[in-house]
């Protein structure tokens, strides 16, 4: 029932009304909710430290102005978008949905985050996102990563650890991913210096 109310409020631009409703319903929410932002949808998770919970509370996408700025910068279909630390797809989902001719590459070492991203890709029927369960850095190496949410402020705060705790993960560079054909620039004369060292 609350999901239907939320989507009604989004469609009719009544986000402020939800601030009151959320204070009541937040205690009863247990399952993920589909939020329909008309041109794309997100699963939002109501658990306290889930980053996507912010969307349930505010009925807006995360960092909407930044997402819109990126979308407006994409002028042709030869563009690729690289989302490092993609989490549930806050940037990638709207960009891939609204610019469905470009290639979107998502990187996140968190299996939990990638599962949420995969669910959102499927929910939107998106075909132009490729995702990788790796960290991105200057050099290829292994590192440790802990995505136990109890250790962080929220699910958007996960980070690679300098300590020897958590799961061992791969770190790869954008240069290496291009050279190995994992990331394929659409133009052969792409500016490699523009992404060197990432």
Regions found by a protein language model. Name each.
Residues 195-197:
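Switch II (G3) loop of P-loop NTPases
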Residues 133, 189-193:
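Short beta-strand segments
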Residues 139-140, 186-188:
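Short gly/pro-enriched beta-turn/loop segments at secondary-structure junctions
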Residues 32-36, 41, 142-144, 167-170, ...:
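Ser/Thr- (and often Asn-) enriched beta-sheet segments in non-cytosolic proteins
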Residues 1-186:
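S-adenosyl-L-methionine
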């Amino acid at each position: 029932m609350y999901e239907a109310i939320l989507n009604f409020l989004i469609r009719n631009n009544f986000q402020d009304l939800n601030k009151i409703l959320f204070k009541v319903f937040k205690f009863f929410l247990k399952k993920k909710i589909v939020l329909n932002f008309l041109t794309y949808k997100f699963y939002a998770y109501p658990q306290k430290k889930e980053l996507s919970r912010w969307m349930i509370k505010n009925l807006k996408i995360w960092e909407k102005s930044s997402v819109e700025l990126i979308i407006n910068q994409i002028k042709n279909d030869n563009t690729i978008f690289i989302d490092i630390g993609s989490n549930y797809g806050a940037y990638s989902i709207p960009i891939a949905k609204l610019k469905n001719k470009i290639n979107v590459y998502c990187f996140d070492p968190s299996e939990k985050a990638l599962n949420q991203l995969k669910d959102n890709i499927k929910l939107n029927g998106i075909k132009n996102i490729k995702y990788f369960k790796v960290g991105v850095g200057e050099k290829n190496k292994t590192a440790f990563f802990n995505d136990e949410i109890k250790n962080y402020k929220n699910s958007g705060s996960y980070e690679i650890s300098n300590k020897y705790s958590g799961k061992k993960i791969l770190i790869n560079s954008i240069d290496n991913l291009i050279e190995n054909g994992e990331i394929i620039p659409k133009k052969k004369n792409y500016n490699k210096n523009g992404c060197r060292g990432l």
